[in-house]
């Protein structure tokens, strides 16, 4: 009998599922809406994940098959309370024989470095850094959520842009091309309308403004460039903190991997970050291959499958 497993990467803006056989060969992939778990919102995340699992099985005509292991890495699940709430919301749905929930950063670290040392920096809707030192010890930095932290993330950049636009409307900041660009992206006509828009905006909606900020920065706008520069510095601080904590020195030789939509290859944020890391973390060895967190979730599922079948 051939067994299948499913690996899930659930972020704030999208959820990526990979179906694989017991040898780890990819059978199908699908993408759905964001499923990041927020306090008190586990049912919503579970609904999205369940739908993505069904879509993934349908895409490879395996709706009649029960996956042996469903391995889920989801933003917000680094906190035990939210992780337990999500597990409770999912376990009754009988999506798989075995269900395991990880943080999004742990599955990404697995894909980036397997069992080896390194620091992974993620910037998507939110941001977090996670690392493993030479001794095997692990630690995280950031990931405090959209209200308290997530510095250098898409949502954080979007919030900073709103502050700049409203300050420019007051005359506290110089005029900026961000004003027109942000109003257009938010599909509103007046700066005053931003109050209502922002009050109802989810982190993913704030993050949708980040590409606009990067585009305006590329066109030479000083305020947009200042936001991007500050985002870079905030992200660098995450890496430096873990370098000190796990490797003893921010100048130590350490592998670094970048992940998340804001740090996709070719983005302005990634290019500036790569340049800054050369001086800020001189011992850093930047990985150029693409990190696929869902693939890390599949790898975790295969380990569990091996234990179950042993």
Language-model features and meaning:
Residues 30, 68-70, 90-94, 136-145, ...:
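Glycine/charged-rich beta-loop-alpha catalytic/anionic-binding loops adjacent to active sites
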Residues 78-80, 107-109, 128-129, 264-265:
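Short, active-site-adjacent cap segments at secondary-structure transitions
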Residues 38, 56-95, 100, 110-113, ...:
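Short beta-strand-loop/turn "lid" adjacent to the catalytic site in phosphate-handling enzymes
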Residues 99-107, 122-123, 151, 285-295:
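Active-site nucleophile and cofactor-binding loops and adjacent substrate-binding regions
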Residues 1-65, 111-117, 162-310:
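ATP-binding/phosphotransfer module of carbohydrate and carboxylate kinases, centering on a glycine-rich
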Residues 1, 97-120, 137:
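Conserved phosphate-binding catalytic cores of ATP/NTP-utilizing and phosphoryl-transfer enzymes
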Residues 116-172:
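Glycine-rich phosphate-binding loop of actin/hexokinase-like ATP-binding domains
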Residues 71-77, 123-125, 254-265:
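Glycine-rich beta-strand-to-loop/alpha-helix junction loops that act as flexible
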């Amino acid at each position: 009998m051939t067994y299948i497993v499913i690996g899930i990467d659930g972020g704030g803006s999208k959820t990526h599922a990979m179906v694989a056989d017991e040898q780890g060969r990819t059978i199908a992939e699908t993408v759905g809406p964001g499923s990041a778990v927020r306090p008190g919102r586990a049912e919503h995340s579970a609904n999205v994940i369940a739908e993505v699992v069904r879509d993934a099985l349908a895409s490879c005509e395996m709706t009649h098959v029960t996956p042996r292991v469903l391995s889920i890495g989801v933003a917000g699940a680094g906190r035990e309370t939210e992780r337990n709430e999500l597990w409770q919301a999912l376990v009754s749905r009988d999506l798989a024989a075995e269900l395991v929930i990880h943080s999004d950063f742990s599955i990404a670290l697995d894909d980036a470095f397997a069992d080896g040392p390194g620091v992974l920096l993620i910037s998507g809707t939110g941001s977090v850094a996670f690392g493993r030192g030479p001794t095997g010890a692990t630690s995280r930095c950031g990931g405090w959520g959209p209200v308290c932290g997530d510095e250098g993330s898409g949502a954080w950049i979007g919030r900073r842009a709103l502050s700049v636009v409203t300050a420019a409307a007051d005359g506290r900041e110089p005029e900026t091309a961000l004003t027109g660009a942000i109003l257009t992206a938010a599909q509103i006509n007046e700066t005053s309308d931003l109050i209502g828009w922002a009050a109802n905006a989810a982190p993913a909606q704030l993050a949708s403004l980040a590409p606009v900020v990067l585009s305006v920065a590329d066109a030479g706008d000083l305020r947009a460039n200042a936001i991007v520069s500050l985002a870079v510095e905030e992200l660098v601080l995450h890496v430096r903190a873990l370098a000190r904590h796990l490797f003893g020195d921010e100048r130590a030789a350490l592998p670094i991997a970048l992940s998340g939509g804001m740090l996709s290859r070719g983005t302005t944020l990634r290019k500036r970050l790569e340049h800054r890391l050369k001086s800020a973390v001189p011992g850093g060895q930047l990985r150029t291959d693409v990190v696929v967190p869902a693939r890390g979730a599949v790898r975790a599922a295969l380990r569990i499958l091996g234990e179950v079948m042993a």
